[in-house]
Amino acid sequence: MLFAQTQPANAQDSQAAKDQVDELLKGELVPENDDAELTEDQKKRKKEIMEQESLWKNPDFKGYNKTFQELHQLSKTFANNQFRLALSNYQSGVNTIMKNRDWVEQYRKEEAEKKRLDEKWYWQKVDRKAREERVVYREKMKAKQDALNYFSKAINHLDEIKNPDLRERPEFKRLLSDVYRSWIMAEYDLQNLPQTIPILELYIEIDDNEKEYPAHKYLASAYSFEENMIKKTKGPDDMLFKYRYKKNVHLLRATELKYGKDSPEYKHIVNVINRDEVISVAQ
């Protein structure tokens, strides 16, 4: 089992997350033992290469020119190793988040069941609730930071896979999308909104991810944050208009994807954007 499932209320979420991870092949990006698919010439060359490597075996060799050595990053073996490491870190990150959710639910339950004979005044209850929320917030932020570290490592491992053909495989794109999405949510919750923008932009470039309205919702929010920061710091107008434009583009796209162009929600957003005087959209 990848995730702790101590509380029934979170069991469904935990199982859904586990199922999502289990679909990622079992940690292999591409089969390595594919001799059956090789031509006779390729088999012959492979045998000759193995013989040459055996003759020239020198574990202490350190190449001065790294270019030739870097070619191993294009191999299936290297790609599979990096894919497994990325998957392992992704699983650890998700597991960290799920365990924290279980802990929060258990903590709230235990606090609610405690007898409060010493609480005689309403303000005492308010003060206690505030303390409890501070504890929950602190634990949530710690878990999200720990998870973010795992997700960042997963991204780094996937970035190491240089073979363009392997990067186009559905297994690679699936894991990359899952890691990006989890990284974005954790980073956003840690109040690092500007940092989510480049990863969000990369996310919507993968296959049909652009059709997911939450990605545009997050982008609109992040660009809105940047716009407001420019206002507060009295930054350059060109940057202000740039962020405002991008905010409106993604706000409109998120509304279109969720509600449809014929919906009252979409028409309302069009009016809001037109009042923003950045882009004009025909209703």
Task: List PLM regions with ranges.
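Flexible helix-coil transition and linker loops at the boundaries of alpha-helical arrays
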Residues: 35-38, 68-82, 118-124, 136-140, ...
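Alpha-helical adaptor scaffolds
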Residues: 165-209
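Amphipathic alpha-helical repeat scaffolds of TPR domains
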Residues: 21-28, 37-54, 77-135, 170-186, ...
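Boundary at the C-terminal end of the N-terminal hydrophobic targeting segment
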Residues: 4-11
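Terminal, low-structured helical/coil segments at or just beyond the last alpha-helical repeat
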Residues: 237-283
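Helix-turn-helix repeat elements of alpha-solenoid scaffolds
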Residues: 54-70, 141-160, 189-201, 243-244
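Surface-exposed, polar/charged faces of alpha-helical domains
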Residues: 77, 102, 109, 116, ...
